[in-house]
């Protein structure tokens, strides 16, 4: 997020092609150990700040929709696992973030501050290595001795 508004790859999308990527949670790794981050209430979705663009590699190619999730420096609990985290869009900023008439560059700093407050309240736990698919992937691992994060 620190450079999205100036990097040629993302600058135009930051200005007017912004999206929200909903998620029930996300994975992050500390070394080879996966962790799962989720909101306090299971019925609440995370609103991750995203950018999108359309590209066409050649005149003979079909148009392709591309998207990316913006990240920012991790804070609080997420920082104990990884140095980056998804930028979360607070409910009060959703309309502004999605409004293409507003230059997104001016929204990044206030959203980063408000999003950090949301991220600080995330629940997280270690999970088994991600193999396969299904709800079992987010079940906490029961360890006999507590894991040390530092």
Stretch-by-stretch model annotation:
Residues 1-150:
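A structured binding-face within diverse protein domains that lines the active/interaction site
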């Amino acid at each position: 997020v620190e450079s999205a508004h100036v990097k040629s790859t993302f600058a135009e999308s930051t200005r007017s092609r912004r999206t929200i990527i909903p998620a029930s949670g996300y994975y992050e790794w500390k070394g080879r150990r996966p962790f799962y981050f989720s909101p306090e209430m299971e019925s609440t979705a995370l609103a991750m700040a995203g950018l999108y663009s359309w590209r066409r590699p050649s005149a003979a190619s079909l148009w392709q929709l591309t998207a990316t999730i913006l990240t920012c420096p991790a804070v609080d609990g997420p920082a104990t696992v990884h140095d980056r985290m998804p930028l979360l869009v607070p409910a009060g900023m959703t309309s502004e973030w999605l409004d293409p008439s507003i230059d997104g560059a001016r929204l990044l700093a206030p959203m980063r501050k408000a999003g950090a407050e949301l991220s600080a309240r995330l629940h997280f736990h270690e999970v088994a290595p991600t193999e396969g698919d299904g709800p079992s992937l987010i079940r906490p691992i029961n360890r006999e001795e507590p894991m040390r994060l530092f």
